[in-house]
Regions:
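Contiguous, often N-terminal, cationic amphipathic patches that form binding interfaces
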Residues: 1-78, 83, 95, 99-116
Length: 116
């Protein structure tokens, strides 16, 4: 991902997904992360570390593409929440890694009334 004088620095897609998941869950209007399909949902319910749920990271030639599967709070303006998620995720990944984010694709999987 990055070359330095002493060698190459690689950050795994899983590490990036953990960062993005934490940042997205703090965004206004996001209730939860979601699975992209039923098979993935069943796997993610197993008792493993679930911090990467709802995040797919694709690392290409010096750029990153992120797909996010989210549950949005019912009654919020979906497009505004989605745009906020995009800009927030892009900012934090670029700040942490110094690598451009080519796209942050938002997939709204459900709407839910938050527990607050």
């Amino acid at each position: 991902m990055k070359e330095s004088e002493t060698g190459r620095i690689e950050v795994s897609p899983g590490a990036i997904a953990s960062l993005v998941s934490q940042v997205v869950l703090e965004c206004y209007g996001v209730v939860d992360m979601a699975s992209k399909d039923l098979a993935t949902d069943l796997i993610e319910r197993l008792p493993f570390d679930n911090r990467r749920r709802g995040v797919d990271v694709h690392i290409g030639d010096d750029q990153i593409v992120i797909d996010l599967y989210v549950v949005i709070e019912y009654g919020t303006r979906i497009i505004t929440v989605a745009q906020n998620i995009q800009s927030t995720a892009k900012y934090y990944v670029e700040k942490a890694l110094g690598v451009p984010v080519a796209a942050v694709n938002i997939h709204v999987q459900d709407l839910r009334i938050s527990a607050d």
